[in-house]
Amino acid sequence: MKIPEFKEYYQQLISTSSISSTDSSWDEGNAKVIHKLAQWCEDLGCEVEIEEIEKGKLNLLAKLGSGEGGLLLAGHTDTVPYDQGRWNYDPHTLTEANDRFYGLGTADMKGFFAFILEAIKNINWKDQSKPLYILATCDEETTMLGARHFASNTSIQPDYCIIGEPTNLMPIRGHKGHVANAVRVTGKSGHSSNPAYGVNALEIMNEIMFALMNLKNKLVKEYHNPGFSIPYPTLNLGHIHGGDSPNRICGCCELHYDVRPLPGISLDGLDNMLRDALKDVEEKWPGRIEITPLHEPIPGYECSADSPIVTSVAEICGQEVETVNYCTEAPFLQDLCPTLVLGPGSIEQAHQPDEFLAFSFIDPTINILSKLMYKHCF
């Protein structure tokens, strides 16, 4: 049996397309890449479980060693779609140029699994006392289906978890959540010369937007976490469309907005705040306002600054532990054990044409993962 080299792992991960999308014409599942990972993990001595959550949507859990506790290294195997016309390189070919690996998933984040496998190869596991787990999930880029399902159904109880999203190898112990809703107003169209014959959806939406802006100001005043660069929840009105002509009363209008709650603000609590903000408008215009989520809400996440994993990882990386404003699978895996986000590459490369991972991350990442394995599995 020939164990692949690091670059070969990377090449095969990138060349095996695993796009997830809410657009069915793009969505292709992750089965092929999961089965590749399964074979590699088995070749390195791991026990492997694969679970199909929905058709073509798979989670993998690999286990090396036995005992209680241990370390969970986690990541997602799906990528976003891409615009071929904006890429200078083939998204599904690992291209070496400018001291970088180019390709879809090099940074976000299929490439992380190549680092895990390479670190495993570099360690003598003879005196291992606690298990190492590897979790590879599906659909992080859309619904976070894989992480949600795993956290709700697994029986494993690791001591700590590291999620390998691109953080420039800076440890992350917290991030905000994300809630996005559509508000649809149905009015009654008519000729603009006689407003009494219609119900203007744009005018109702104006009342809704005013109420949401009041809530935005309330969130800024009432919630504060100094651990974040933007220390309050944000509310953004991101998209609006309504009407079709200046001489027609607008019959329909739709607004999309998002909220990024701080850790500690429950999703139910936030939903109640949003509904309370619009209560008066809904009572004034019964049956004309419909609110629907644009995706499953993601809660905020925070690992205690006093957790031993925070101190351990900060020492190994030689960097202070920070917080960020984007989302990961951490809120779900944090339910299992203290969880940090730490991985090679920059979040600025995520979802971008010519996504890349700089070669300068290779040796430090393998070194950090090896040290984490030694510290928490021996």
Curated annotation (Swiss-Prot):
What organism does this protein naturally occur in? Aliivibrio salmonicida (strain LFI1238)
Q: How is the cofactor bound?
A: Binds 2 Zn(2+) or Co(2+) ions per subunit.
Reading the lineage from the top rank, the first entry is Bacteria
User: What family does the Swiss-Prot or TrEMBL record give for this protein?
Assistant: Belongs to the peptidase M20A family. ArgE subfamily.
**Keywords, alphabetical:** Amino-acid biosynthesis, Arginine biosynthesis, Cobalt, Cytoplasm, Hydrolase, Metal-binding, Zinc
- CDD domains found in the cross-reference section: M20_ArgE
Report the protein name in the record.
Acetylornithine deacetylase
- Under the cellular component aspect of Gene Ontology, which terms does the record hold? cytoplasm
Q: Which residues are named in the active-site annotation? A: 78, 140
Q: What is its main location?
A: cytoplasm
